[in-house]
Amino acid sequence: MATKFPKFSQGLAQDPTTRRIWFGIATAHDFESHDGMTEENLYQKIFASHFGQLAIIFLWTSGNLFHVAWQGNFERWVADPLHVRPIAHAIWDPHFGQPAVEAFTRGGASGPVNISYSGVYQWWYTIGMRSNTDLYIGALFLLITASMTLFAGWLHLQPQFKPSLSWFKNAESRLNHHLSGLFGVSSLAWTGHLIHVAIPESRGQHVRWDNFLNVLPHPAGLSPFFTGNWAAYAQNPDSTSHIFSTSQGAGTAILTFLGGFHPQTQSLWLTDIAHHHLAIAVLFIVAGHMYRTNFGIGHSMREILEAQRPPGGRLGAGHSGLYDTVNNSLHFQLGLALASLGVITSVVAQHMYSLSPYAFLAQDFTTQAALYTHHQYIAGFIMTGAFAHGAIFFIRDYDPELNKDNVLARMLEHKEAIISHLSWASLFLGFHTLGLYVHNDVMQAFGTPEKQILIEPVFAQWIQASHGKSLYGFDVLLSSSSSFAASASDSIWLPGWLDAINSNSNSLFLTIGPGDFLVHHAIALGLHTTTLILVKGALDARGSKLMPDKKDFGYSFPCDGPGRGGTCDISAWDAFYLAVFWMLNTIGWVTFYWHWKHLTLWQGNVAQFDESSTYLMGWLRDYLWLNSSQLINGYNPFGMNSLSVWAWMFLFGHLIWATGFMFLISWRGYWQELIETLAWAHERTPLANLVRWKDKPVALSIVQARVVGLAHFSVGYVFTYAAFLIASTSGKFG
């Protein structure tokens, strides 16, 4: 007899209902719960799966390179980056009529194509790629790398190559290896690529494998390095009149601290970027030698944590017991990793536009908008995941004995204070921000706009001024030429930085006013409310006054039956589920703000944002409605254009989003009755009744229906805004 899905759970495999399928899918990745799973096998499975993950990433990036080389216009774009639209790939669609074929044939292509809004053209150009051959070689290299990682994953599942549990628990070796090897050496290698290939290429000197060993990246070679005259590498940088990718105005410096942007490309100086990566490399290679492994020297993580006890004794046992708690809990480690990754992803979103690293990216407005939005949404999903695994840690891995009176135990002991403070902050922000917006709406509606409450963000303006923005006239720190801060850096990076921060042609420290003040606090409301829900979910995951034995019910449970009133919706999973809605809400406000602010900046019409962003109708009418009007009338009986595909995506994004509510609002009994009726009809319908199934149809559980609803809500939400963002930006700026 064939074994039924799921193989990993005999209990589920023998379930006579369709629950077998849905619960099987739901628990497929919950390795801990699988039959016969040991701790060692768990670590080995996860370790091997990382190689599979890398293989997928390399295959995907290889595909990007291959399709641009095959179907794109990279070489044409390289010749004129500001006026040629970069092509992602061709479109082969049998549904296209002649108007569609004409509308989508652009960028010098012979047939319909997709325009690239990912920034890969700018990235490849900046790092020294110039021809389709370069792209093909890159694609081939990544394909080989993908094969190698796939093989490595398979290899580490073979008995003789499976690492032991003690190897996985060796925190110091792993830290050294990852700090020095992963971050340090890879940063050093990247510095090498920038200095040997990218910087010469930006100066019109072509370096490839054939001449790699005979072209000196710097006229003086390595002698300044060995004689200690390192300053030589910073002398004679590219001039402000340098034309990128040519020798015109080019210098010879390879490691600089110029500050600001290259005037033509509006991106950071490549020599500054190389210097940054070299500094990071040195820092991490040193950091990777700090922990005690083979030679009995260096730090022990356990000793560091045990030593962290607050003096005076009133603040408990500090970090005592944390080493074993963290080292023995994969959920704790994953929570920390996701929190770090979430923060860095949001920082990437912020820096990709404000300190643009790639040549000509700053002039490609749609790509900037797409990259910002993409990274901000991903950051939101990753951050909510961090709290989810934090909650699972408290349920499955937390040992009260091991953590007596340390920071974790004390967090749990005063959770009421934490949760109520977050609640107070959320309520304060919500009522005051909404109150100001609504007051301003009323004043606009009654024809007295001068009675709006408009608050200048003076503290934020002061911070901008202290970084060198002179517009506000604060004359403080870097915006005051007589300050010590200004004189200390005057001969190095400061002139370039001051030019950049006071220029109106980039997004560094945008001028802010009352509209920014309001939306800043709306975003703060969203962040605090999301955090409140997530923190409450994790801190109440083990139990609460209402349900002291909650941890015995696991991470996700619908209710403890009708006997205990009020136990519905209080599992840690429910908190995660609710928080995702607030997270999406918050990222929505963040991206709305960023996009509208930049649209008006790029159009030279900042007054529109300044005047309309102080009341809600302004946001709805002058941002959402005004910019979606092309999409709402995207295709009609009189024809279509290249925005039609986004208009269609805008529509079906809304439909997916709306489908979510069907699962979120109607509950299990409705679906059970419906399914039983459908099964009855199916079994009595000719032809249809030839198809039979062995599993008795049962409705999704409450938790599963919520997952389905949440998935539709999230996917529809993202699709809708993606279509709106790309269409409204590319429709204006091409």
From Swiss-Prot:
Binding site for chlorophyll a B1: H654
Protein name (Swiss-Prot/TrEMBL): Photosystem I P700 chlorophyll a apoprotein A2
Keywords, ordered alphabetically: 4Fe-4S, Chlorophyll, Chloroplast, Chromophore, Electron transport, Iron, Iron-sulfur, Magnesium, Membrane, Metal-binding, Oxidoreductase, Photosynthesis, Photosystem I, Plastid, Thylakoid, Transmembrane, Transmembrane helix, Transport
EC identifiers of the protein: 1.97.1.12
GO molecular function, one term: oxidoreductase activity
Record membrane topology: Multi-pass membrane protein
Native organism taxonomy: Eukaryota, Viridiplantae, Streptophyta, Mesostigmatophyceae, Mesostigmatales
Cofactor remark from the record: P700 is a chlorophyll a/chlorophyll a' dimer, A0 is one or more chlorophyll a, A1 is one or both phylloquinones and FX is a shared 4Fe-4S iron-sulfur center.
UniProt binding sites for [4Fe-4S] cluster: C559, C568
Organism: Mesostigma viride
Gene coding for it: psaB
Pfam families reported in the protein's UniProt record: PsaA_PsaB (PF00223)
